Amino acid sequence: MSESTDQYALPADFSDRVFGVLLAAADGAAHARDAQEPGETETLALYLLDGLLEALEWAHDGVASDEAACMWLAALRWYKLVNKSFPEGAPEPQPRWIDEAFAGSPALATGDSQNLLALDNRDMASVGRPLFPQADTTGVLTRAAFVALLPRVDEATTAKIATDAAALTHGSPAAHRAAGAAALVVRAALESGTGSVDRWAALVQEFALEEPADDEAQGTEADANASDSAERHSDEATAGETPDREPVNTAGAGLFRAVTYVRNALAHTAPKAAYDALFEALGEEPDVETAAFATTLLAAVLGTDAVAHRPASEIDPVLDAMHERWMALTAGQ
């Protein structure tokens, strides 16, 4: 991983936006679970971010490191948090600060079942060696949002790390592409706020076809630009979720849905109004992984204001510590 300290200037409020994204992942997941917390969705993303942090620590000390391997070892430590033991035959990495922070925590609310299924293996999955080549669910999205918090690297690096993080549990190339796009969407939001919404539409346009429109809308799709398509599919995504047509929960469909809902929610200038509009769009029983990602995207634009109404949580000390460690190493703050 190549890093530059001067090529990529950080926004003045970068620290607040990073903290907002961390808070939002926990808040969005808890909101979707009717306030059950902590849960697998946000804790796995935090562990994977700590794995990336460990790789950065090694690099800071002049030692070559493999980001994907460090994230896998972190994921194994998360597996132990959930199941009280490591997968049979898998490496047993030494604990880090986050393991101590979560020691004694209650049973976690469930998330994407594919994560535990894939990690229950002695071998590390990768893009070139997928263990579940058909796995394509929304569980890759929140970790991709956290990867976007890495500053001062080029977009190709952001997308690659997010893809590698997704490949640890999900083998489908479509899921890998969605993870890379998700990270770039959040990165754009962190860097340019609402000025990046047209870029979001372009990044996720590939996945719009996963929720097909009715015949009339399909007939005009070829002539629509990315922004118009995003708005059109927003209505289709909501209208299509009927009893005889379940919503598509592939990573790409979840990403497209989240980006569209956040884009529309930002029409409200007040952060709380935008937040409420987002969850109204997500529905009464939203997919937890999609809701968590959507809330992180909102916070990437609005910073901590996006979740300023959030009540105190038992996960807050971990979020505080992660924010402090991350900013100290990546931004010198």
Task: Go through each PLM region and give its residues.
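Structured, active/binding-site neighborhoods that engage oxygen-rich ligands
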Residues: 1-333
